[in-house]
Structures are given as C-alpha cells and as structure tokens.
Regions:
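A short acidic, helix-capping loop that chelates divalent metal ions and anchors anionic groups
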Residues: 72-78
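Conserved N-terminal glycine-rich FAD pyrophosphate-binding loop of Rossmann-like flavoproteins
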Residues: 44-72, 207-224
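Flavin (primarily FAD) cofactor-binding/catalytic cores of flavoenzymes
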Residues: 2-43, 47-49, 78-211, 221-395, ...
Length: 432
C-alpha cells in the first residue's frame, strides 16, 4: 500500500531571514498587524551572531533604549546588558510573542517568481509574497590580505574568532584597527592581563565616552539627532574633549571628520570608550602606525618599526555577506549594501525588504523596531487579508530536539514541514 505524500503546508505571506534582534522585531511588528511571518534561521537558536561574540561583550547602548517593543529588558540585567543576558532576553522575546521560527534552515538564494519570491533553502524551496532579509550588519568578518602573512609563524585572527579576552593573557598582542570593535576589545585585553598590547591605527577614530559623571551619553544622542550634522559633530567633539582631553600626545590626533560626517560618508560608526582611553593614558596599551606587511616573525609598520607579537588580532570590520543570497537581483550597491534606505522598499523589487543594514550613532538596536514598523505598515497596506495560499517548504525532514546540554525547553511550532527544528519561542519565563 502506497503512503500518500504529505500535503504541503500553505506558505506564509511573509518570510523573514534571520532570527536576531532585527528579524524578531520584524516578526513582532507584522504580528501586531495580524500578519503571520515565518522566520528562517540557519543557527540552532535565536541571536546566532551574538552567541559567536566574545564572552566579555556588553551593549554600549543603555538597557532601556535597547529592548524591543512589547517586552522590556529586565532591570536586574543592569545598565549595560551583557552578551549572555541579551541572548536570554531575545529568547524570552521570541517566546513572549509566540514567534514561528524554523531553526537549522540555511537560506541559500532568493529569486523572483511571477507572484512573489522563492527562497532556496537547505530544507527545500519556500514560496512567499514578501521577504524581509535581516541576517545582520556584522555578518562576515573581513580580514585584510597582508603581504607575507602566510609566512608569519603565529596566529592571525579576526576579533570575531576570539571567544574570551582572557584566552590571550600573558601574550604580546598586535591589535589592528581602532574602530568600535577594536576600542572595545582593547580594554578587555588589558584587563585580561596581556603582556603587551599594540594598537595599529590607520585613521584616528572618533571616540565618545559611554557615560559622563555616571550619566549615560546614549540619551543625549537622541536629543542631538534633530540638529544639522555640523552641529551634531561640534557637540560630539566638545564632549570628547571634555571627557578625554587632547589624545595627540598619546598617539591619537583629533580625527579630521566628526563622527556623524564619517558615518555618513564611510559607514564607520563612533567608538564607545569602555576603558580604552584610560589604558592609553596609563601606557597599558600603545598606539602604533598602520600594519603594512609581515616579514617572517616581524609585523612591519608604515613607519618602518618592526614588532614581534605572539598573535595578531584584526578588528578590521565586517561585510554584510548578502551577495550569495541577493547579489544577482541588482538590489545591492558595489559595497554589497542594500540600495534601499532604512525600512524602505527595495527599488525595482516589490515585496523585498532589508532590515538592520544602516547603522546609527543613536544605537542600532533602537533602529530595528523603527524599521520593522515601517516595513510592517507597508506590507499591511498591500494585503487585502492575511490568508495563506502559496506553497510552503517542499521537502520533509524530521524535527530535532534542542541542542545537547540546553537548559531551555522548546515547543514545536504548528508548521514544521521541511525544517530541521521549529519553535514558537523558547519556554522561558520573562522576568521584570
């Protein structure tokens, strides 16, 4: 007797790619408008990018301006929320909103169809009317190709590969880059007890204090956002000068462009001080010129100086990594960045949205709900109803249990066709 093929589940009207803060914000915003969305996540839990960051990481935006609508980050998580606490919060958020998340599904390619979009995934093809891509701004670590690096006898790592700063205790570290991630990890490296820390700087960074006299600076950036750019930059320079003084004697001259102009023209955001400047002034770290090449065990700098570090740590930024997914659609610029503005329709690609790819000094986490609401409102205006009528994932795979050792109990979603694991959110109890 032949076993009949299972009937494919009706496809959701919206598919979201990525279960980080941006993807979760999008799903919740759509839910509030009565629109069902399925989130496809290649990892085995929410917040994959956060899980892959070093353990000392904390938000540099204040707690109450970093949460998502509908659930506050608990007060007992402190003013500056830790990586682990933020991951826990996102899990609670997914459970609180009963979001439909399909884990262990890698979206490989996106293509147009006569009636919408088709996603090619590791679990089969998925058809839908609308797609929101929210895979993350800092998705693919970028490492320069320095001459001679193949012969360098010691590790060369991107900061994204570092699990804990304490792992480098007692070592001589050359940190390349003094942007946001470089300034942040430098403080942790000194605190962890590295033997020596050189910070290679090509362009002097804009650095702002996280707080002044115990008062967080983050809310002030919201007040400044209505001013013209030149006045915002002037205010930022004044704040930096009052907080740090002149850092030129310590190897960091005043940047040519203010933080807002630099963000607009280069996409490089401001660095937030978490101890970097104090360590610089007390000579616990040293600024050196740009790394140009390697010569055997030597790291050769632009001014001819040679260092012999035990490890080179590159804080050289990230790429969006969107080319395999959408590069063939003509929706990305030459830098691989979406051509659409924050929360705006994608030119010549109706039904395709990008969320979380535009940084803001006011805080990226604060931006995600703003963009999500814009997208949800626009999608709602295109739908006469919230019915489902397109074909879902075609292949069938058994559902899997939670990862070994997990203390979180997961609940199966109503729709599991073709996915490795589905959840309507983690069974955790939010605290307040």
């Amino acid at each position: 007797m032949n076993t009949p093929n299972p009937t494919p589940e009706p496809a959701p009207p919206v598919v979201i790619v990525g279960a980080g803060s941006a993807g979760l914000a999008a799903a919740a915003a759509l839910q509030r408008r009565g629109i069902h969305a399925v989130i496809l996540e290649q990892g085995d839990g929410v917040a994959t990018s956060w899980r892959n960051r070093h353990g000392e990481l904390r938000l540099n935006t204040i707690r109450w301006l970093s949460d998502l609508p509908g659930l506050r980050i608990p007060r007992n998580r402190g003013r500056w929320v830790s990586r682990d606490d933020y991951i826990d919060y996102l899990e609670q958020f997914a459970h609180h909103h009963h979001l439909d998340i399909r884990f262990d599904v890698h979206v490989q390619r996106l293509d147009r169809t006569p009636g919408g979009w088709r996603l090619t995934t590791s679990a089969g093809d998925q058809d839908t009317d609308q797609v929101v891509i929210a895979t993350g701004y800092d998705q693919v670590p970028w490492l320069p190709d320095w001459p001679g690096q193949a012969e360098f006898p010691h590790p060369i790592l991107h900061v994204a590969q570092l699990r804990r700063a304490a792992d480098l205790a007692g070592q001589r570290v050359l940190l390349v880059g003094a942007g946001n991630s470089g300034v942040e990890i430098a403080g942790h490296l000194v605190d962890a007890g590295v033997d020596a820390l050189w910070v290679s700087v090509r362009t002097p960074p804009n650095i702002l204090p996280r707080q002044i006299a115990g008062t967080p600076l983050h809310p002030l950036t919201l007040a400044l956002r209505l001013l013209p750019e030149r006045l915002r930059d002037a205010n930022a320079r004044t704040i930096a000068r009052l907080a740090f003084g002149d850092l030129t004697p310590h190897g960091l001259p005043t940047p040519i462009h203010g933080p807002y102009q630099r963000l607009r023209t280069t996409g490089v955001t401001v660095a937030v001080d978490q101890g970097f400047v104090n360590h610089l002034k007390t000579t616990r770290l040293h600024i050196v010129t740009e790394l140009t090449k390697f010569a055997g065990p030597d790291a050769v700098l632009r001014d001819g100086q040679r260092l012999q570090p035990d490890i080179v740590l590159a804080a050289t930024g990230f790429r969006r990594g969107l080319e395999p997914l959408a590069g063939h659609l003509g929706v990305l610029n030459t830098a691989g960045q979406p051509r659409s503005g924050p929360g705006q329709p994608t030119p010549d690609a109706p039904g395709l949205w990008f969320l979380g790819y535009h940084t803001a000094i006011e805080g990226n986490l604060r931006q995600h709900p703003i963009e999500a609401r814009r997208i949800a409102r626009a999608i709602a205006q295109t739908r006469p109803n919230n019915g489902r009528g397109r074909r879902g994932l075609r292949s069938q795979q058994p559902a899997r249990s939670s990862p070994a050792g997990s203390t979180q109990q997961t609940t199966r979603g109503d729709h599991q066709s073709g996915v490795a694991r589905s959840t309507r959110g983690r069974e955790t109890t939010p605290t307040s």
